[in-house]
Regions:
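Beta1/beta-strand and adjacent pyrophosphate-binding region of the FAD-binding site
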Residues: 3-14
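A conserved short coil-to-beta-strand element within the FAD-binding core of flavoproteins
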Residues: 73-85, 93-97
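FAD-site-proximal beta/loop scaffold in flavoenzymes
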Residues: 1-5, 98-172
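Rossmann-like dinucleotide-binding cores of NAD(P)H-dependent redox enzymes
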Residues: 21-78
């Protein structure tokens, strides 16, 4: 994938998203925008995440310092194409409202939509676990105690025709580990 001269959109505000921002800049992207569905975290200490919880604070990496537009509270709704080429992504502003039962805040779409021009998009989201609705549920895949897809050493799922790898199996980790997992499963598929 070559980012030279492209309008790059990175969907996801974590470490993997930061890696995508840096790589796009080093490839010579025309512009790089990074969006995150969550609110912008505070700088410094966050009273909402005291020790020993994972600290939710604003992180500005060396990749961000190389240059990008960073935006928060945006959900991606759809990709927009023209003549088989991506030209943008429709995004919508979201709000986070307290849960009636006191649990995690709930996302509410505001109806405020816009198009972010992009001809290359990197998907770098999903820190907690794979989405259970959709493929996992429809294919009746078994999951482990952390809701990751359960596999054997070769990457087979409970459905013997399907393999899984990367963060969907291990949980959030480094990109290089996901790549290694993908290569190992590819070898299993090739056998």
């Amino acid at each position: 994938i070559n980012c030279k001269g492209k309008k790059v959109l990175v969907i996801g505000g974590g470490d993997t998203g930061s890696d995508c921002v840096g790589t796009a800049n080093r490839h010579g992207a025309a512009c790089v925008t990074q969006i995150e569905i969550m609110p912008q975290p505070p700088v410094g200490q966050n009273p909402a995440t005291p020790w020993p919880m994972y600290p939710q604070v604003l992180k500005t990496s060396s990749s961000h310092e190389e240059g990008c537009i960073r935006r928060w509270n945006l959900a991606s709704n759809r990709f927009i194409g023209e003549k088989n080429n991506l030209i943008g992504v429709e995004v919508e502003e979201v709000e986070w409202v307290p849960s009636p039962d006191g649990g995690r805040p709930q996302m509410r779409q505001t109806g405020k939509k816009e198009i972010i021009e992009a001809d290359l998009v990197f998907l770098a989201m999903g820190f907690l676990r794979p989405e259970q609705e959709g493929l996992i549920k429809e294919l009746r895949l078994a999951t482990d105690n952390r809701d990751n897809i359960a596999v054997d050493n070769a990457g087979y799922t409970a459905n013997s025709n399907l393999f899984a790898c990367g963060d969907a199996v291990s949980g959030a980790s480094l990109v290089v580990k996901a790549m290694a997992s993908g290569r190992n499963v590819a070898r299993s598929i090739d056998r």
